[in-house]
Regions:
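Residues that define the transmembrane beta-barrel architecture of outer-membrane proteins
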Residues: 84-86, 287-291
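Transmembrane beta-strands of outer-membrane beta-barrel pores
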Residues: 64-70, 96, 273-277, 299-301, ...
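Acidic, low-complexity, intrinsically disordered peripheral segments
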Residues: 12, 68, 396-487
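Boundary at the C-terminal end of the N-terminal hydrophobic targeting segment
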Residues: 7-9, 14-16
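A glycine-/polar-enriched beta->alpha junction
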Residues: 24-34, 41-56, 90-107, 118-125, ...
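Outer-membrane beta-barrel translocator domains and adjoining extracellular loop/strand segments
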Residues: 70-77, 104, 217-219, 264, ...
Length: 487
């Protein structure tokens, strides 16, 4: 379990030292992710609003009337007649059938909810990609600063040795100047690296929610596919980009049915009870009661082209959404391909850079020994030292790029999510919020009217949605530090 969230400026008992801690904290407290979850609740309400089409409405009204009506009577008889009336009533309306319009609206709203959940998954993947990026950026820059500091120490020793040789006439003033110049350059590079580390720490704080400490090495990402074909297969099923496009098309398809249903007849019951009488002087016994009940059947014949226009617009939107599925599919293929290629090249760079570091270290150590006995010049030593440092820096960058690329592959597949990456974290389940409002203001006869109205519209097949179970082999490999459970 990860620690409770606090404001960035608030003191904390412990810092997120591992990648699992960082992911858990960002998953729980990142404002962008929290805002997206709140937005999803707005979409949930669209389903409730759609169902309201087959639920009763109750309205009340109260009127008061005062009127003076002129008379034709001669004076001194009254020249006007005063009338004051009051009335109050309650009207109850219940739609029994509206040609499948409400059933289609419910199907469209359900698909919109599911599409919004896929949008939330996309946001989560984006945030976690930023967390991984920020984490390994800090780790990279910490290692670079360490290499630069070590480089400064080595060059300081080299300058001392060169000066000692100069004192006894073994080297010239030029050798001393070369060592001094290299040391000055190393100081400047260290300052630059420290500045970059501060920038990376600020980025980490922004996305995770707290300042980084000395971060632990990142673990191997879980669930990495063995081949690019496996990555494509997973993305075809689990990519939120593709899933959202499909859900959006389902919604617009249901809206076509809803638009067509506007031309069908509707049946409603309406009942009214009211009282009316003289306001002044008020006498309850003078008020008469009126009770009416009626069945209303409505069949549109002509709407000025409104319904036809709505149908054409809905059809055009559904066509666009069906085309967008292919666009989303191509986007996913591109993302997986690019991420896989980047990962493959980065891993290859790690292998070659490791060999380069090994060879450069042997060369540097040999050059140092040969310099001590006069077989190498100061410049030879400085060049060998610079070659070794460049190789070490290249290896650090290669490790960084490979890990970011691996996270990119998981993101393109649709598996860069907390449920796949970490254990012991209370996962956000969007279905929980939806279930709370799904049957809000429900009535015992809702199911009967739903089935009756559905007879007027073709069914749009949709999945149940919700959080999918972890696939086999997708057990999270990381666990954040223990802490109090999420509220």
């Amino acid at each position: 379990m990860f620690a409770a969230a606090y404001a960035i400026a608030a003191p904390r008992a412990a810092r997120a030292e591992s990648l699992a801690d960082a992911i858990a904290l960002a998953y729980r407290s990142n404002p962008t992710l929290q805002a997206q979850r709140a937005t999803l609740k707005v979409t949930d309400e669209a389903y409730v609003q759609a169902r309201a089409g087959l639920r009763p409405t109750v309205t009340g009204n109260v009127t008061a009337l005062y009127e003076e009506i002129p008379t034709d009577l001669p004076a001194p008889l009254p020249q006007s007649e005063r009338v004051n009336q009051g009335s109050a009533g309650i009207t109850i309306s219940q739609t029994l059938f509206n040609g499948g319009r409400t059933a289609a609206a419910e199907q469209a709203a359900t698909a919109e909810v599911l599409a919004a959940r896929e949008g939330l998954r996309q946001t989560e993947a984006t945030i976690l990609q930023q967390v991984v990026q920020a984490y390994v950026d800090v780790r990279r820059d910490q290692e670079i600063v360490g290499i630069r500091e070590n480089n400064l120490t080595v060059l300081s020793g080299q300058l001392d040795l060169t000066r000692a040789k100069f004192e006894v006439g073994q080297v010239t003033r030029t050798d001393v100047a070369q060592a001094e110049a290299q040391l000055a350059a190393a100081r400047a590079l260290l300052t630059t690296s420290q500045g970059q580390l501060d920038i990376s720490r600020a980025n980490y704080t922004a996305v995770v929610g707290e300042k980084p400490g000395q971060l632990a090495p990142e673990p191997q990402p879980p669930g990495m596919p063995g081949t690019v074909d496996q990555a494509f297969d997973v993305a075809e099923v689990e990519s939120p980009v593709l899933a959202q496009a499909r859900r959006t098309e389902e919604s617009s398809r249901a809206k076509v049915v809803e638009a067509k249903a506007a031309n069908h007849l509707s049946v409603a019951l309406q009942g009214t009870i009211g009282y009316s009488g003289t306001l002044a002087p008020f006498d309850p016994n003078d008020y008469g009661r009126t009770v009416t009940a009626q069945a209303v059947v409505t069949q549109p014949f002509f709407t000025g082209g409104l319904n036809s226009s709505n149908i054409r617009a809905a059809l055009a939107q559904n066509t666009a959404d069906r085309i967008s599925i292919e666009g989303a599919h191509r986007q996913v293929v591109q993302q997986v391909s690019q991420a896989w290629s980047t990962m493959a090249s980065s891993r290859a760079n790690v292998t070659s850079d490791e060999e380069q570091v090994r060879a450069a270290r042997v060369a540097f150590e040999g050059t140092q020994e040969e310099y001590k006995v006069g077989l190498r010049t100061t410049l030879d030593v400085l060049i060998a030292e610079q070659t070794l440092r460049d190789a070490e820096l290249s290896l650090v960058q290669a490790h960084h790029d490979a890990y970011v690329a691996e996270a990119g592959v998981l993101g393109a597949m649709g598996r860069l999510e907390a449920r796949y990456l970490v254990t012991g974290v209370v996962l956000y389940n969007p279905a929980t919020s939806f279930d709370k409002v799904k049957h809000a203001n429900g009535l015992p006869w809702d199911g009967v009217l739903d089935r009756l109205d559905a007879l007027g519209a073709p069914r749009v097949v949709q999945d149940a949605g919700g959080v999918k179970p972890l696939p086999e082999g997708g057990t999270p490999a990381m666990r954040p530090a223990d802490g109090p459970p999420a509220p």
